[in-house]
Amino acid sequence: MSQAPLVLVDGSSYLYRAFHALPPLTTSTGKPTGAVKGVLNMLLSLRKQYPDSPFAVVFDAKGPTFRDELFAEYKANRPSMPDDLRVQVEPLHASVRALGLPLLCVEGVEADDVIGTLARSSAAADRPVVISTGDKDMAQLVDGHITLVNTMTGSRLDVDGVKEKFGVGPELIIDFLALMGDKVDNIPGVPGVGEKTALGLLTGVGGGLEVLYASLDKVPELPIRGAKGLPAKLEENREQAFLSYQLATIKTDVELDVEIDKLYPGEPQREALIALYRELEFKNWLDDLLREAKEAGENGEAETPIQAEVDYDVVLDQAGFDAWLKKLEEAELIAFDTETTSIDAQQAQVVGVSFAVKEGEAAYVPLAHSYMGVPEQLDRDAVLRALKPLLEDPKKLKVGQHAKYDINVLANASTPIALRGVAYDTMLESYVLDSTATRHDMDSLALKYLGHSTIRFEDIAGKGAKQLTFDQIAIEQAGPYAAEDADVTLRLHQALWQKLEAIPSLARVLTDIEMPLVPVLARIERNGALVDANLLGIQSRELGEKMVALERQAYDLAGQEFNLGSPKQLGAILYDKLGLPVLSKTATGQPSTAEAVLAELAEQDFELPKVIMQYRSMSKLKSTYTDRLPEQINPRTGRIHTSYHQAVAATGRLSSSDPNLQNIPIRTAEGRRIRQAFVAPQGYKLLAADYSQIELRIMAHLAKDDGLLDAFRHDLDVHRATAAEVFGVPLEDVSGDQRRSAKAINFGLIYGMSAFGLAKQIGVERKEAQAYIDRYFARYPGVLAYMERTRAQAAEQGFVETLFGRRLYLPEIHSKNGAMRKAAERTAINAPMQGTAADIMKRAMVAVDNWLQESGLDARVILQVHDELVLEVREDLVEQVCEGIRPLMSGAATLDVPLVVEAGVGSNWDEAH
């Protein structure tokens, strides 16, 4: 039986490659971790491939090597290690050691030399060797025993592979490198000899440097460009060529106090890994480790308060339920959760309910489990009737995790319950505390704030097509899972609320904005929107016909048929066949066919990219809306019930899904037609109330700029007013083009647009765009002062705030990476405006909902999109409702300029604009 190969990993090479090739991940405090994660992923993959192999991860040691003594300029061109990479070296070394993998660093030589020595030693003992590297220098080591693998690309090089890739065998790789040199390592080589010339010389004379220099008289006859002048050039640089040979040669005789048989990996140090993964915020790996520790019955770092003894009840009889009902009535705060048949709250059926009243004391009441041999359960409606007074009592405080879902489930239950008194929601507590620090699901929060790995749904229900619904799960498994949900929710609230109370402005955002909004959003979701499925069917057919016509047009332009949805085929047509300029490449080095690239090509008047963009736009509308919306109609209500998400957008904005209303195009005819399919029922109208230029008004308020304040206070067309200032013309003489340019400047500056971006948008030279921006700031100095002030505050504090105290943390504001830092600065300027607009809309939604509930009017909010509320109103009440909601929306905040609300009415959503 053959021996398992020795696996040698070029750690230094992969560290650099991972840093430059992978996304720049950071922790919630801004600590870079992307390179660490990339290298660890690669190591774990290699260990799976070679489970029985001795293994060593080799890194360059600090300090000079023998090559620096040979040539003082060695690696002089290489820039110093970036700070964001330097800080990842120690955590990576610590993680490698904690994984039980042998790690080698030898002073005076490079990692290549250590790898070369171990590889040759192992090969001499007839053991195969696998070197994992992306470094071309290593090709010189390849022989019958030694193979190279590049884990990042999946490529493998044996002797034949080296010949195919480089044109010479492993025995000539050093000579090849010596002739052509290496700019990265500053190996000089022979000036004027590149890859093709070096290859021609070595193959032409049939040997390496020694043979070449003994055969200079044959060089002029070789079929190489400039061959006649090469002998003189080679002779002149003879010493440099042989120096380069020495520099490029990997040592294979380094004195190492290492025995190959001692390089077998040891057991991972679980506690050390848990501590490291916590620090690096590697959530999934940490979760797996904690779960393993729990299953193994280990404590130490893996121990959490929840792993201590808990008292979880599964309530199957009336006496047990009565006892828990008494506990709930006596508790100051109840954590609750529902278990159901579906993640769709509008279709889910209650399977059970769980509660916790103090840490470790929780219960699950199964109500509708259904499988062979299921124990007898309490009657669902009887239990819900008994819980109804408690759950509907607004004075009985409750905490949930994503409570909006439970509110809707209980409202739709066979015994409907109007859940009130939900004072806290751990998802929203985490979101308000720091919207970007972590995901806000319970599993992630438990891991982050409690150090606890929860029972996952997949653990009890399975995965994929065979996954059980909750009613099919055995009560013995369902009980601990459901009771833990309630217990963890209570513990999370205690941890998170303490942090929020320490920052009163954030506590107010939770209690005054986010929590009052929860029942409002739940009601909007239940209300749903009526859509005309027949009209959507007609639109779908029409879009399909237009797509067929665009396909034909694309085939004509390409001169052949191809799959318009295939980036590979499209790339071949655009770049190989039509010869369009390559503006950008993908991560794999292929010419990009991304939307932004096609848009740029279309701007250069290339026809095919224009057609492809039109085709893609229509394809997306068809698949996402005209085909999909009819499928999303709830069979019980006949309406579409979108889901609103409070804890997704970093700035505080709401987002939506199933369907995503935010992405319906506003300006295209096709997008407007989709809005026409959102209709009012007979006897009703749709009322759309929209904030006018809310972010610009907030900018005027924040910047305190007299010019902008004056324009809004006098109800001027702010874009026309800006155009008059920037272009130096009277207000009445502003042209349409000037107004459009001014609008681009107004909105562009909010989003941190550069002169380059503005020039592209309005079709002028960059210098001209910069002149417009300069004139803008000269006319509106308050805006420039606000931007500079905000950048400085963000850098000092690490966060920015809305008018209502919501924070957006910006860990990249101190990044050494200039692009990331600039992006954080742009976010710092925009986030207070976008976040304040979000806060105002949320406050308005609560005010409007309260008024509608108190008034008893036959009107309801059915949609919230961007800065707009859409209501369904009985026809004879339209004027009354319009007059009622306008002051509520405009009064949602007090600014230095008026908050203007524009309203429209129609039989469908498009008509209401």
Curated annotation (Swiss-Prot):
Protein name stated in the entry: DNA polymerase I
Subunit-structure text: Single-chain monomer with multiple functions.
Any one GO molecular-function label of the UniProt entry: 3'-5' exonuclease activity
Domain 5'-3' exonuclease: 1-305
Reaction catalysis annotation: DNA(n) + a 2'-deoxyribonucleoside 5'-triphosphate = DNA(n+1) + diphosphate
Pfam families the record matches: 5_3_exonuc, 5_3_exonuc_N, DNA_pol_A, DNA_pol_A_exo1
InterPro entries per record: 3'-5'_exonuclease_dom (IPR002562), 5-3_exonucl_a-hlix_arch_N (IPR020046), 5-3_exonuclease (IPR002421), 5-3_exonuclease_C_sf (IPR036279), DNA-dir_DNA_pol_A_CS (IPR019760), DNA-dir_DNA_pol_A_palm_dom (IPR001098), DNA/RNA_pol_sf (IPR043502), DNA_polI_H3TH (IPR020045)
Family listed: Belongs to the DNA polymerase type-A family.
